[in-house]
Amino acid sequence: MRVSGALFLQFLLLVVPHISCWNDEAVLLRDVQVLTLYRGRYTTARRSSPVPQLQCIGGSAGCGSFTPEVVQCYNRGSDGIDAQWECKADMDNLYRFGRVEVSCEGYNSPNDAYVLRGSCGLEYTLELTAEGKQQQGSSGFSGFASNFFQGFSNQKQQQRGGGGDGGGPYQQHSYQNSPSGDGVGGLLVVAFLLLVAFVVYKMFLCSPTNGHQGFGGDQGYDSTNGAWDNSQGMGPPPPGFKPDYYSGDHSNSRPGYGFSDSYTRPQSSWTGFTGRTRPGGGGGGGGGFWTGMGTGGILGYLFGNQRRQPPMGFAGPTYNSNPSPAPKTSSGTRTASGFGTTKRR
């Protein structure tokens, strides 16, 4: 009787650790030969929460630049610790896999040799190839501005997309792909452009201040023959844009080799180099600049709205046609590979 009890105990010790293999949801990881993972799908979960099957975690290309549709990972054997994987996907020639890691949920614990069926996903970094780095370096500010204005246009279309009447076969569908951060990014870019315009205006177009009286003919410049009169002991001014930046000795001198005098003194209060003022002349030299810029912006906005506005009375169907950001041009696509190990959760 004691012998039979000892044998039964040994049988339990041998069988109980492998009971999980009788469960259809538990899979021995070393028996998994291929994983096919899709963009937009999630893994199964038992002890934790589902995670995306394809999850970018960084890289020089940025996670928002490209996401493969399908990735297949092949079990290439074990390094004595865990399974090693080779993952392949069709990618644009601008991008490549960096670090890849297959993440699976252990059935009973993170250290379990069995994993939950369907719980494996891929974490990867997305890097730029040599072609991608070259194109990124040549894009500069133009690509940034193009993406900004396209995103702003998409946001305006999204705001108009939900205005249709409900219930009919021609009900309008709202747009869903516009990013929520376009508004904040747009304000930042507009503020930056206004700052640049203000700096250019102050440096090159602003009228003289602090008592500068232009370039009178009795202050060292002979208006009759265009020569410089050095009788007052003042040399010609240094080259520059505005007399405001000169020293006190040259505050009343003729402008140097920068912009013409029409940009460095009030337009409405001087008739030339004679020092005479017009009757009732004003002093605001920047009004035309700001007025022109504001008028152009308003007209451009209204013209763009008219081009995108559908005809009145037309209630035809609209579709989710909000365009995605324009892709970068490249020489084509190829099958990219990445190599990595296993992570358990």
From Swiss-Prot:
Main location: endoplasmic reticulum
Cytoplasmic side, ranges: 205-345
UniProt keyword terms in alphabetical order: Calcium, Calcium transport, Endoplasmic reticulum, Ion transport, Membrane, Signal, Transmembrane, Transmembrane helix, Transport
Transmembrane segments: 184-204
Biased composition range(s): Polar residues: 223-233, 318-345
InterPro entries: SARAF
Pfam families tied to this protein: SARAF
Ranges where the record places region Disordered: 155-178, 223-289, 302-345
GO process annotations (BP): calcium ion transport; regulation of store-operated calcium entry
Compositional bias per record (Gly residues), positions renumbered to this chain: 160-169, 278-289
Keyword Transport: yes
Positions in the Lumenal compartment: 22-183
Entry GO CC: endoplasmic reticulum membrane; endoplasmic reticulum-plasma membrane contact site
Cleavable signal peptide: 1-21
Compartments where found: Endoplasmic reticulum membrane
UniProt membrane topology term: Single-pass type I membrane protein
Function: Negative regulator of store-operated Ca(2+) entry (SOCE) involved in protecting cells from Ca(2+) overfilling. In response to cytosolic Ca(2+) elevation after endoplasmic reticulum Ca(2+) refilling, promotes a slow inactivation of STIM (stim1 or stim2)-dependent SOCE activity.
PANTHER family given in the database record: STORE-OPERATED CALCIUM ENTRY-ASSOCIATED REGULATORY FACTOR
Family that this chain belongs to: Belongs to the SARAF family.
Protein name: Store-operated calcium entry-associated regulatory factor
Source species: Danio rerio (Zebrafish)
Name of the gene this protein is made from: saraf
